[in-house]
Amino acid sequence: MSHTNLAKETLLQFMQAMYAWERKATRNLRNKADKEILKDELAAIFNQFCTSKKTLRAREVSLSIRFPFDYKLETHPIVAEEHDGNQAYFYIKENRSGIEALYRFQMVFQKEKWWINKKEWLDDGKWINSFL
């Protein structure tokens, strides 16, 4: 697998892990004991795939979930990608009830591995920081 394909594969694995977490969390967030387990599972996903930026990981604090889910591969396809050495950008289109949004994930290659470093969404021609 090529260097840049590894970046895409890392993002897809992250999205699959997050989708599984979102599905589990919608069923279990009402139970206080399950909240701690969900928080630990989410932290493990972030530790495996993401840099340690606190703003990127705001969901660890809120445990928020949107419906429809944020990371369902069928409804959030990668529509474009850019590569520049040790950085890669993947653009994901979201369609919620006819309202489209474009997200951009920045990946960085550090310590012999690709990491998600930033998520942004396009608003009025400007990229705005978002959290995972």
Where are the regions a protein language model picked out?
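Poly-acidic low-complexity segments
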Residues: 2, 26, 70-75, 117
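Short, aromatic-enriched amphipathic alpha-helices that serve as compact interaction elements
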Residues: 2-25
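N-proximal accessory regions
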Residues: 2-5, 9, 36-41, 84
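Short hydrophobic/aromatic beta-strand element in the GNAT-like acyltransferase core
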Residues: 11, 89, 104
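A structured, charge-rich N-terminal accessory region that forms the first stable segment of a protein
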Residues: 17-56
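Surface-exposed, charged secondary-structure patches
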Residues: 41-99
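Short beta-strand edge/turn micro-motifs at domain boundaries
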Residues: 100-131
